[in-house]
Curated annotation (Swiss-Prot):
Residues 1-345 are annotated as: Required for the correct localization of PALS1 and PATJ at cell-cell contacts and the normal formation of tight junctions and adherens junctions. Residues 479-660 form the Guanylate kinase-like domain. Residues 120-177, 179-235 form the L27 domain. This is Protein PALS1.
Length: 675
């Protein structure tokens, strides 16, 4: 995987962290020049590698063009030479007749036909004989002297060896170039054609389908793909060629790196341009580069498989490496950056509290490497070496995702979200109050960045990014309390009551506290804990209640100790709470499992309520849907899972399945719960 990485999109980095966060307008977003090479999926443009056969074809074409130019130049020179005194003198010599020049004897010479031109191959003896004939033809002293020099040159052993080499190269260059495959997967192309032809009932389409399905055609296509795959493989570079190329970089310290890269394993590196240089910017976890440990950030790439890289644009590097696999030979100038040996990084697991789409992020260093995720996803962060851009895998994708993806670092995400909020507040117009409505006193907030190190608890006012998680398997004798959350008329109370009625030995509710007087049929400790108002208010001040309220001048509430009593009895405590109670519950030691009961569509919700004899107004239904969105937006980071209650029976079965799964499978919980 090779991409380009442009620095300075968002920050100026220093040892102290981020100096500046510049959120530009969409028109001013930096232009991405990253081109993913060898990246999983169909990313970027692909170009066939240049093989030796194709190079020879181009060389041969260049030679043909040079030959034509030489002929044109020769004609011009001939006009000038005809005016010379020497040629005038030679023209006075009577022409000889009957001279047989072996140069033009095609029967003795080897004539090779080429797609471009015919080449005559002569021996040294033929050249020597031709010069002898010319020597007898020219009678002036200057010509005789010139011919004598040529005869001596032809008899020289070095010239004869060079002449043989010339003939050998000419023969090789004259051979027709072998065809180069356009694609190596013609079988896939034929399958696409067959898919297109399925609905076609015309005679020609059916004939083509039958022809493509014929065994001989199928065998031909298979043979084509096998040969094409071998043809498209680059020829390995020899040590001699590598060492010869090193000499071109005289005083520079270079190193040679060889990496074996399989077709299905990306290289896993990013590059950037610095002037004419191509510099390795980032090593991505999971790629061949990271596994080899031979490529490092800051190395300058001089050559890849004998092809010079210095001076190339990152797009050209993309084209070059798009289909390379096998042995890759890099000639590098090692980075001058002094870095401590990399410490063994521990993998941390985090729960995402926001949605992220790299295609909509103008600041991601490489969009092809960006990892998209949704609120509630578990991410396995394997590298925080770059504090702004972590490398991570999404839960469940480790086997299908060979390369780690880039996700925003925690502090980076917090800072830019804080900056966005500040900008939005500054742009928000001041609404003028009306005469019949009191103007709301808007509290002025100090514009400071959120410091994650000072507070790990989340408020609705705080910026939610990630929460570190750990796997937890509940003990058999200490069940996690089940909390049902949802808007009114969404069925959470009905689901809770059905569980209580059907499995009384397994589920129980916490006994609430109250300040009202006990009635005759009530039993203290079974129906309510009856306490004084003074004691109740003292417990509120001490934070002992999960939630509480006042009804008809009496206080009611559910305490943490009441829930703990149910857990200690070995039963599962069932609670239906308001969202305001979730933070207190999460900060306790009860380890709650919170399930959000969401309503179905507005029409389906109307039908469900009609079965219960309710006839809600359209505005009431819209209010329920809007309340659902509000609860998800403000408290969704507390939810472990959600159930859409489109059918009460199905919702009950799904709820029971989730509760049973807590006994058989470990679940992700905040790491602070286990410390």
């Amino acid at each position: 995987m090779t991409t380009s990485y442009m620095n300075g999109h968002v920050t100026e980095e220093s040892d102290s962290g981020i100096k500046n966060l510049d959120l530009a307008s969409p028109e001013e977003y930096p232009k991405h020049r990253e081109m993913a090479v060898d990246c999983p999926g169909d990313l970027g443009t692909r170009m066939m590698p240049v093989r030796r056969s194709a190079q020879l074809e181009r060389i041969r074409q260049q030679q043909e063009d040079m030959r034509r130019r030489r002929e044109e130049e020769g004609k011009k020179q001939e006009l000038d030479l005809n005016s010379s005194m020497r040629l005038k003198k030679l023209a006075q010599i009577p022409p000889k007749t009957g001279i047989d020049n072996p140069i033009f004897d095609t029967e003795e010479g080897i004539v090779l036909e080429s797609p471009h031109y015919a080449v005559n191959i002569l021996d040294v003896e033929d050249l020597f004989s031709s010069l002898k004939h010319i020597q007898h033809t020219l009678v002036d002293s200057q010509s005789q002297e010139d011919i004598s020099l040529l005869l001596q040159l032809v008899q020289n052993r070095d010239f004869q060896n060079a002449f043989k080499i010339h003939n050998a190269v000419t023969v090789h260059m004259s051979k027709a170039s072998p065809p180069f495959p356009l694609i190596a997967n013609v079988q896939d192309l034929v399958q696409e054609v067959q898919t297109v032809l399925k609905p076609v009932h015309q005679k020609e389409g059916q004939e083509l389908t039958a022809l493509l399905n014929a065994p001989h055609i199928q065998a031909l296509l298979l043979a084509h793909d096998k040969v094409a795959e071998q043809e498209m493989q680059l020829e390995p570079i020899t040590d001699e060629r590598v060492y010869e190329s090193i000499g071109h970089y005289g005083g520079e310290t270079v190193k040679i790196v060889r990496i074996e890269k399989a077709r299905d394993i990306p290289l896993g590196a990013t590059v950037r341009n610095e002037m004419d240089s191509v510099i390795i910017s980032r090593i991505v976890k999971g790629g061949a580069a990271e596994k080899s440990g031979l490529l490092h950030e800051g190395d300058e790439v001089l050559e890849i498989n004998g092809i010079e890289i210095r001076g190339k644009d990152v797009n050209e590097v993309f084209d070059l490496l798009s289909d390379m696999h096998g042995t890759l030979t890099f000639v590098l100038i090692p980075s001058q950056q002094i870095k401590p040996p990399p410490a063994k990084e521990t993998v941390i697991h985090v729960k995402a509290h926001f949605d992220y789409d790299p295609s909509d992020d103008p600041y991601v260093p490489c969009r092809e490497l960006g990892l998209s995720f949704q609120k509630g996803d578990i991410l396995h962060v394997i590298s925080q070496e770059d504090p702004n851009w972590w490398q991570a895998y999404r839960e469940g994708d480790e086997d299908n995702q060979p390369l780690a993806g880039l996700v925003p670092g925690k502090s980076f995400q917090q800072q830019r979200e804080a900056m966005k909020q500040t900008i939005e507040e500054d742009k928000e117009p001041e609404k003028s109050g009306k005469l019949w409505c009191a103007k709301k006193n808007k509290k002025k907030r100090k514009k400071v960045l959120y410091n994650a190190n000072k507070n790990d608890d989340y408020d609705n006012e705080e910026i939610l990014t990630y929460e570190e998680m750990s796997l937890y398997h509940q003990p058999a004798n200490r069940k996690r309390p089940i909390i049902l959350i949802g808007p009114q008329n969404c069925g959470q109370n009905e689901l809770r009551q059905r569980l209580m009625n059907k499995e009384k030995d397994r589920f129980a509710s916490a006994v609430p506290h109250t300040t009202r007087n006990r009635r005759d049929h009530e039993v203290a400790g079974r129906d309510y804990h009856f306490v004084s108002r003074q004691a109740f208010e003292a417990d509120i001040a001490a934070g002992k209640f999960i939630e509480h309220g006042e009804f008809e001048k009496n206080l009611y509430g559910t305490s943490i100790d009441s829930v703990r009593q149910v857990i200690n009895s070995g039963k599962i405590c069932l609670l239906s709470l308001r969202t305001q109670s979730l933070k207190t519950l999460r900060n306790s030691d009860l380890k709650p499992y919170i399930i959000f009961i969401a309503p179905p569509s507005q029409e389906r919700l109307r039908a469900l309520l009609a079965k219960e004899g309710k006839n809600p107004k359209p505005e009431e239904l819209r209010e329920i849907i809007e309340k659902t969105r509000e609860m998800e937006q403000n408290n969704g980071h507390y939810f472990d899972t959600a159930i859409v209650n489109s059918d009460l029976d199905k919702a009950y079965q799904e709820l029971l399945r989730l509760i049973n799964k807590l006994d058989t499978e470990p679940q992700w919980v905040p790491s602070t719960w286990l410390r």
